[in-house]
């Protein structure tokens, strides 16, 4: 049941389990304050709400559309100034509700919760901005979007009635060991990919990222001198599944795609993209494909730029989450 719900929400572009997981992590972190978990505890509320607050950028999806949401998601709202501001607002509201509470204590734990959100986003494959005025999203490609081990560890901290320094120390140690284990799993996956494609291809780069749902599988995007290859590797048996092997198109056509407004948006969104070309009634259709996320026999995000025989842009549109979805993009003709 969980896997079907996750597949549905991911394909629709709203990963509801993501903020829920952040909230659970925030609750777990609040236990380190030594205070009981409860709805009447401002530290509990502050830490858990703070852990979900950076995803306030989801409002862009409902005010505008998916393309604006994708552009801003895990952006400025995840940077240090935004985390401080959000923590301040949450602290102010909680202090009004609990005037007898220590305001600095609430702010500290709310800020820790908010910071945990950005740090856990950095640990997975989407990444997040941490520094304002730096558009690059930092990512470590270690954790799945919904990570069962992290969630289980958080739930133990929340529901275990008796907690002491041994429990807290053990929890932190398990988390650190788990991160190292995920790092070694990714390293094993990369080695398997290199061994499989070393013969017959000149490898330029390999990006390895956690599968959306499978704990023992890792997705990869392999760039070679002739092809871009997207697939998945099972680290238990080192079995490689090649999902798509796409031949690189003419560099001039790729340049036209990247020079369009739709292409600029798309290449900023995805560090791992491929451009395909096909002709249709005197027009050339350039299609950008985000090679990172593959669901239901297709990639999640696309962008299309249509040009004439003189390489002038006729139209362009973005296709986030669903190939059939088309969001027109204004171009300078």
Residues covered by each model-derived region:
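N-terminal membrane-targeting hydrophobic helices
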Residues: 2-202, 206-210, 217-224
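C-terminal regulatory/interaction regions
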Residues: 196-333
């Amino acid at each position: 049941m969980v896997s079907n719900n996750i597949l549905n929400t991911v394909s629709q572009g709203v990963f509801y389990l993501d903020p829920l997981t952040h909230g659970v992590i925030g609750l777990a972190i609040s236990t380190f304050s030594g205070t009981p978990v409860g709805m009447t505890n401002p530290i509990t509320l502050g830490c858990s709400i703070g852990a979900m607050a950076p995803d306030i950028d989801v409002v862009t999806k409902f005010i505008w559309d998916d393309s604006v949401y994708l552009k801003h998601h895990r952006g400025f709202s995840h940077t240090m100034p935004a985390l401080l501001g959000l923590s301040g607002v949450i602290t102010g509201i909680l202090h009004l509700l609990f005037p007898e509470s220590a305001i600095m204590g609430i702010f500290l734990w709310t800020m820790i919760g908010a910071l945990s959100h950005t740090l856990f986003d950095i640990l997975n494959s989407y990444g997040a901005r941490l520094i304002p005025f730096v558009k690059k999203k930092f990512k470590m490609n270690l954790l799945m979007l919904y990570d069962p081990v992290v969630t289980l560890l958080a739930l133990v901290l929340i529901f275990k009635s008796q907690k002491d320094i041994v429990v807290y120390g053990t929890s932190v140690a398990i988390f650190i060991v788990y991160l190292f284990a995920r790092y070694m799993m990714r390293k094993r996956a990369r080695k398997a990919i290199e061994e499989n494609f070393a013969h017959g291809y000149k490898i330029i780069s390999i990006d390895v990222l956690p599968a959306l749902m499978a704990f023992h599988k890792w997705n990869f995007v392999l760039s070679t001198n002739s092809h871009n290859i997207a697939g998945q590797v099972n680290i238990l048996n080192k079995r490689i599944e090649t999902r798509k092997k796409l031949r690189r198109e003419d560099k001039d056509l790729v340049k036209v795609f990247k020079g369009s407004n739709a292409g600029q948006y798309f290449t900023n969104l995805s560090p791992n993209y491929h451009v395909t070309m096909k002709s249709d009634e005197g027009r050339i259709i350039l299609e950008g494909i985000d090679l990172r996320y593959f669901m239901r026999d297709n990639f999640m995000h696309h962008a299309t730029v249509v040009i004439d025989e003189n390489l002038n842009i006729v139209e362009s549109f973005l296709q986030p989450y669903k190939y059939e979805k088309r969001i027109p993009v204004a171009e300078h003709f």
